[in-house]
Amino acid sequence: MKKNFVIICAAVFISNSSAAQGLLNKSEVVFTKQDSLRGSITKEREWWDVKYYHLDIKVNPKDSTITGSNTIKYQVVQEYDRMQIDLQNPLEIYKVIQDGVELEYNREGNVFFIELVALQKPDAVKELTVFYGGKPKVAVNPPWDGGITWKKDSNGNPFIASSCQGLGASVWWPNKDHMYDEVESMLISVNVPGNLTNVSNGRLLSVKKLRDGTKTFNWYVSNPINNYGVNINIGDYVSFSEKYKGEKGDLDWGGKYLEVKGSAARLGKRDHSFTGGAEIIDTLEALQLDTNR
């Protein structure tokens, strides 16, 4: 019986394998030039190593637009004078400035090629600023379908979030959109209406209230980060912070409630959104200690 079962399984496997091979032969994957520009380490990418980003943007819930700039600091690895920056349609780059000079550029689909004024010398550290804006792609079924979510909470306040692991971060901000080169640190400055809060990556450095009634939240990431990991989460959030007794001393950690405020009393009630957080950190610290032994 066992022998017959094995023979039957083998026959089914061979049959399915042949069918699958036939399907592959009939529908070969065709890569476009855009696929190659997006997925490969092009000449316009390989000559520079990204060191730092300052993403400085205004998010407007009224018209679903994002406008602002990204300052890119980079180290020259090879001599070259043309840079690839990725930004997906329908967003546009308005201008690129380096050392006070407006640079020329041309667009090829979701890729911008920036013409630098002179050959970049190896080991030099330079920077330029890309100004951009428009209405980014709307996420239809996040996080599986990437883009920006523009919704409202139960109180009618805007609820906005980015999701881009599949599509890439260039769906909402200009960058070197390839995972082989992670930026080493980053400042994320997000301007929002005064009644809202933006939660991004890293540590909150400051909140600046402006005369027009808006607020800018400045978040700093001090460690390498993938482009697609950079995010905005904008809504009517309540913040809190706690001290955690770590293996090597106290750690301060904070979070943002995922529910709307409702009232100031919620801070006193604590809706337990982060129940289990300390236990998670306990586990991670224990794993790290085991790894270092």
Give the residues covered by each predicted segment.
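Intrinsic-disorder/low-complexity, polar/charged segments enriched in Ser/Thr/Lys/Arg/Asp/Glu/Gln
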Residues: 52-54, 65-71, 80-82, 111, ...
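Surface-exposed beta-strand/loop patches in extracellular or lumenal glycoproteins
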Residues: 69-91, 173-178, 183-193
